[in-house]
Amino acid sequence: MESKTMDKLEPVIGLEIHIELSTKSKMFCQCSSDYFGKEPNSHVCPVCLGLPGALPVPNKKAIEYLIKIARALNCKINKTSKFDRKHYFYPDLPKGYQISQYDEPISVNGKVYIGKDKQIRITRVHMEEDTGKLIHTGNKTLIDFNRSGVPLVEIVTEPDFSNSDDVKIFLEDLQTTIRYLNVSDADMEKGSMRLEPNISIKKKNGKMADYKVEIKNINSFKFVKKAIDYEIKRQIELLKKGITPKQETRGFDEKLQKTYTQRIKEQAHDYRYFPEPDIPPMVFSKDYLNRIFSDIPELPNKRIERYIKDFKIKYTDAYILTRNKIMSDYFEQAIEKVIKRLNNDVKTQNIEQSIANFIINKKIPISLSLEEFTNRAIKLLSPKETDINLLNNVIKDVIKNNEKVVFDYKKGKQNAIMFLVGQVMKNIKGKAEAKVVLSELKKELG
């Protein structure tokens, strides 16, 4: 019954992702933004505490970082943009409003691909300031304002996801891209990358639902999947009973592995947005944008394409290698050193694919110096000198001890010979190339 219901219904998931930028100072003041693990309320000033008369001054570097992110997500960068006040009341928001962006964000209309062909549309990428942090101790709640005013980029996607697996892949790819740009460590556990999925259920090929549920308090990729899967199941069970889920904000309880009601979800008009009067609108010249674009490094998707085209390595291997920029850079440096040292001595194999295999399969650890890695790689790549007499003696023993396998091979089971190759390689302890073993075995078997 449940599978039939699922056949008729389809989850609709959009994402709001917040990225804390790794600038030295906060978004609108000169306080240090390096708040993690610091003494509470030690990185504050009248601006980030919202004291009367304090005026905000935008952080130029943070805006440049946002433009890099937007470019990496193939967004259109607007020529003009402005900041707005987003009003709501919460203890961690000292001003009673958050400086954010509403109707004129810095960038809009982007798109990225997950896997090879699934497109995810990016609605907007805009700038705002982070809030303080509430710390609950017993029957008291304390506030640490060190985080208040830290530059925060919000990335909003269209509701293009229908399952938690695609969400997880998208987030992992986004985290990798952010780290390549070197604008944030994008660490979910530290809170420098946060996810709020918006989930609803609609009939397949039907119109969008007239509600959506936002999930907060998700701080790892593992819990992303669990929170979304639980919420999809919860909403479907309600719909099966004829109940439309409430439009609300829910939290995720990691211990219970469940979502729970936090508050009724607000509409945009509830925030009473209006332009920030203390910050003039921004105008971005073509030269200014081009200078920022020129500073963007090669990103993972382009690196994957280059590895496949230039190094002739498999897509899956190229994808794995580019998940970590340090590993990817090490791979390229290792290729250069190994090829230089071999000096075309090894022509019969794809050296790049072999080195990729050494790294991915952890046959040679990348914790080694490049020199030591190169020495080990050359040893593995170089043809082995084979003692033919020793090899033939081992082959005779293997044939003698595996009469049934030999019989099967002679009856036409071609794969049987590979078992014999494996036995010979095992007994000779790797002192011969597999292709030499195969050749000598075929001679012996006739």
Predicted regions and their residues:
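Short, charge-rich amphipathic segments
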Residues: M1-M6, Y65, K95-K116, L152-K168
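N-terminal, positively charged regions that mediate nucleic acid binding
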Residues: E2-S81, K86-Y88, F161, E172, ...
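Charged, compositionally biased, marginally structured helical/coil segments
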Residues: T5-L15, I19, Y35, I143-D160, ...
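Short, well-ordered strand-loop elements centered on a beta-strand within folded domains, enriched
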Residues: P11, K26-F28, Q119-R124, A209-I215
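Short acidic, Gly/Pro-enriched loop/turn segments at secondary-structure junctions
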Residues: T23-C31, K133-H136, N205-M208
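Aromatic-residue hotspot detector
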Residues: F28, K79-F89, L93, Y97, ...
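Glycine-rich, flexible beta-strand/loop modules in the N-terminal catalytic cores of phosphate-handling
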Residues: E39-V44, C48-L51, Q119-R121, H126-V167
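SsDNA-processing nucleotidyl-transfer enzymes
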Residues: K68, A72, I77-S148
